[in-house]
Amino acid sequence: DYCMRQYIRQTTELRSYFHAGTQGLLEETLHTSQAKLPLEELEMLQDLIDRVLSGRYSYEAGEERLNLSNGKYVKINFASSGQQETVWVFNLLFYHLMQSQPTFLVVEEPESHLFPNSQKLIAEALAVFGHGRNRVLVTTHSPYILGTFNNLLYASELQNRGHDADSIVPPLQQLSQERTAAFYLEGGLVERAIEDGFVCNELIDGASDEINGELERLL
């Protein structure tokens, strides 16, 4: 489909930009360009990338690598499924965050092959990317992704009411209710999934409620 073709095209065309990884790309741009970059957002995104990947991507000698803290590297095709799935999501977020023009990205199931904590971190990375002029369309089945988005929405709402949410959730990760929408697809129909500014709880907790109810009956 169109989105997949664009994804393949971009990952192929942009590999050489990452010969020294995301940090190398940033340093090269700072030395060669007068463009004003969102350094705070990029620093926060880099931290989230490092925490999920546990290494840094580079494209060297015609191969994609994940460089480890001990000086060794793993070829991407030998990395974990989660690392393989997310490395180019992160690369594209980082690259487009550096660009001067607004970007609309479609990210399909960012939770694939990730532990719950990493799902939370990638949701926060998507929020950082979409904090300014950029837009992101996310498709997901993950209650952890949805739950994280709800926390980021709630933090923004509390901050607007005069409460100190910034000390818990950084402002660059907070999601504005006015700029956030959610929809639920079932039986070929699309329904709104936002209620009072938040993703509907039944979408997040429905499976857990059913599992817990079954456990209670067993006990």
For the regions a language model picked out, list residue spans one by one.
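Conserved catalytic segment of ABC-fold P-loop ATPases
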Residues: 147-159, 167-183
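Walker B motif beta-strand of ABC-family P-loop ATPases
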Residues: 104-106
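Phosphate-coordinating catalytic segments in nucleotide- and nucleic-acid-processing enzymes
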Residues: 1-102, 125, 171-181, 186-219
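Conserved H-loop
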Residues: 134-144
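Helical segment within the ABC ATPase nucleotide-binding domain
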Residues: 119-131
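Walker B catalytic acidic pair
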Residues: 108-110
